[in-house]
């Protein structure tokens, strides 16, 4: 009976780690919880793309479609799905939800599950090295709501929201170090694969962080054991078996196309050291003041990728852990992971608050010597031709950072938003802060041994207060949401003869909304998902559409199989833009107005 009581008590802690994030998440996205099948977090941004991905995977499973080719967008050319992350760790795992309840419900379920599972992963990991359940629970909640996680919630990017596999992988490695059983290494390999299948960024993150963590955590005695290398190979085989089939189409796409980013462009998505100490501008108490008075916060208005605030209490706790914890191998391992996150998030070049590379003037003679030596030409493809020429003409040099060494490598060079590495810093600092709290509790118990019960009670209270303060530092106002439902015009299109659809005005928002609308009306689209690597046909077709009502442009549009053109009077679209497209269609003899459906006007191209 006593054993059963302990077992039930232990299960309660696991349930708390999984369930407590939900009431904390509710204030951030109340509309999503209330309208679960029709609303998704964030404005109409990349979130719609990943709702489409959830739908597409369901269609692949239900109808046997090609996972990496969609013939119904950019019709009749089709869309190479390798232009976007398929995030199989979400789209495949939640495919049953998609098939039963639709892609919006599946997307929302994946988002909410990421907070619950990140909390649970942190709970397991921290409990593995502290053996304190309340402390592990507090670390789990803090780890689930770090600024990186909530910032991407506001941005709607599902691959980056999916952070849970990182702490779960580190937990499996930690358990292997302690138990030295091959099963934990196999589990680590599987979880590593799920990281890659959630986001290719996560693959790169853990390719750097996991070996560093394990090598410093395990120490030489374990690394010298023959059995370890056999176990490690098992883990690698499992990871490769999961990742390689999904990665091959992307690797082939990288060979066909140049998907590398210039360092000057990557700098726009990098941060400088001050950003790690800059609170978020969406905090309910001091956010407005930070936005107005902190120069390092100005870019947060347009770029949530710069929200990398480490948290003052978390940093303080991590410093205590580094100094006081007796688990020196663990502190070194966590410190290394945090350092990888910080250094990599700063990108290949030192940047100012706006993401502009910091340059220093040098004598003209030095510039000429570097030019004669061919060094400027050597870095032209890396920095970008225009930026290199600017440096040459102004006789200035950039300040390279350690990540510049990695940014030359093939896969690393295709990573644009390097500030995403900050998730490693967040999770490692949370682990170090837990070690700091553990060290303080141990010291208190040693000093006041006679008052053990009182020390335990005070320690529990201190952990709860510290967790609340850390969460409050990271807190933000509710996230904007987007309603996705069948519009009257979609109902009309669903009952029309087959023909491709174009939705105007041109722009990312309208184009994304049209992608979801296609799931409702089922007609093909002449345009489609934008993505980080838009297919060449996207730019070509947009250029043709800009020439309407030119007769040659109309003929070109007809060759795409277009029969329906919509003008969406979406909030935020300027009156002059709407007038421009109205005039274009009214002056097209081939176009006939079919009707107005709420705020959307529909035209039929009879002349094609």
Task: Indicate residue ranges for each PLM-predicted region.
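Hydrophobic/aromatic-rich transmembrane helices and adjacent perimembrane loops
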Residues: 309-312, 396, 400-441
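Membrane-interface helix-loop-helix junctions at transmembrane boundaries of multi-pass membrane enzymes
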Residues: 10, 220-233, 318-373, 378-400, ...
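Signature aromatic-anchored transmembrane alpha helix within multi-pass, membrane-resident enzymes
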Residues: 211, 232-240, 339, 431, ...
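Membrane-interface coil-to-helix junctions
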Residues: 21-118, 146-151, 157-163, 270, ...
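Extracytoplasmic
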Residues: 181, 262, 323, 465-608
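Membrane-lumen/periplasm interface segments of specific transmembrane helices
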Residues: 199, 233-265, 273-274, 279-289
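Hydrophobic alpha-helical membrane-interfacial segments at the cytosolic entry of transmembrane helices
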Residues: 13-23, 190-191, 223-248, 263-268, ...
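Membrane-embedded helix bundles of polyisoprenyl
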Residues: 21-26, 110-219, 231, 235-246, ...
């Amino acid at each position: 009976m006593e054993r059963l009581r302990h077992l039930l008590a232990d299960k309660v802690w696991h349930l708390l780690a999984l369930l407590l994030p939900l009431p904390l998440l509710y204030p951030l996205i109340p509309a999503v919880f209330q309208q679960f099948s029709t609303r998704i977090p964030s404005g109409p941004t990349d979130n719609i793309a990943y709702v489409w991905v959830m739908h597409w995977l369901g269609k692949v499973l239900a109808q046997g479609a090609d996972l990496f080719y969609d013939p119904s967008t950019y019709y009749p050319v089709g869309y190479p799905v390798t232009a976007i992350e398929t995030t199989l760790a979400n789209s495949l795992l939640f495919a049953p939800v998609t098939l039963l309840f639709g892609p919006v419900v599946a997307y929302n379920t994946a988002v909410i599950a990421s907070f619950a599972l990140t909390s649970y992963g942190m709970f397991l990991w921290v409990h593995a090295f502290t053996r304190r359940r309340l402390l592990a629970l507090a670390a789990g909640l803090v780890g689930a709501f770090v600024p990186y996680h909530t910032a991407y919630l506001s941005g709607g990017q599902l691959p980056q929201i999916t952070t849970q596999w990182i702490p779960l992988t580190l937990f499996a490695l930690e358990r292997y170090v302690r138990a030295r059983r091959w099963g934990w290494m196999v589990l680590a390999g599987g979880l590593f694969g799920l990281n890659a299948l959630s986001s290719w960024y996560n693959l790169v993150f853990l390719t750097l962080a996991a070996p560093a963590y394990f090598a410093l955590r395990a120490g030489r005695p374990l690394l010298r054991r023959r059995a370890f290398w056999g176990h490690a190979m098992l883990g690698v085989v499992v990871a490769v078996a999961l990742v390689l089939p999904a990665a091959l189409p992307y690797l082939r796409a990288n060979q066909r196309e140049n998907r590398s980013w210039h360092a000057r462009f990557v700098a726009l998505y990098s941060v400088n050291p001050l950003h790690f100490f800059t609170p978020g501008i969406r905090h309910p108490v001091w956010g407005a003041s930070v936005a107005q008075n902190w120069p390092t916060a100005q870019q947060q208005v347009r770029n949530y990728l710069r929200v990398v605030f480490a948290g003052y209490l978390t940093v303080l706790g991590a410093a205590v852990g580094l100094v006081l914890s007796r688990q020196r191998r663990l502190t070194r391992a966590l410190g290394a992971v945090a350092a990888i996150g910080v250094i990599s998030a700063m990108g290949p070049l030192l940047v100012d608050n706006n993401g502009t590379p910091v340059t220093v003037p040098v004598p003209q003679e030095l510039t000429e010597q570097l030019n004669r030596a061919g060094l400027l030409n050597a870095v032209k493809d890396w920095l970008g031709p225009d930026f290199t020429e600017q440096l040459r003409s102004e006789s200035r040099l950039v300040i390279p950072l350690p990540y510049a060494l990695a940014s030359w490598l093939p896969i690393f060079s295709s990573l644009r938003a390097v500030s995403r590495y900050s998730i490693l810093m967040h999770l490692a600092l949370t682990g170090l802060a837990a070690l700091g709290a553990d060290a303080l509790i141990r010291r208190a118990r040693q000093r006041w041994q006679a008052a053990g019960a009182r020390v335990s009670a005070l320690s529990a209270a201190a952990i709860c207060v510290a967790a609340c303060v850390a969460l409050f530092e990271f807190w933000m106002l509710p996230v904007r949401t987007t309603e996705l439902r069948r519009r009257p015009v979609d109902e009309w299109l669903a009952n029309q003869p087959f023909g491709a659809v174009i939705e105007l005005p041109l722009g990312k928002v309208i184009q994304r909304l049209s992608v979801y609308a296609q799931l409702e009306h089922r007609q093909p689209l002449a345009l489609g998902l934008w993505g980080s690597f838009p297919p060449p046909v996207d730019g070509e077709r947009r250029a043709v559409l800009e020439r309407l009502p030119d007769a040659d442009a109309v003929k070109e549009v007809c060759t795409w199989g277009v029969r329906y053109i919509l003008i969406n009077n979406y909030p935020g679209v300027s009156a002059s833009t709407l007038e421009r497209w109205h005039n274009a269609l009214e002056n097209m003899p081939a176009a006939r107005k079919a009707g107005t459906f709420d705020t959307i006007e529909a035209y039929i191209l009879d002349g094609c």
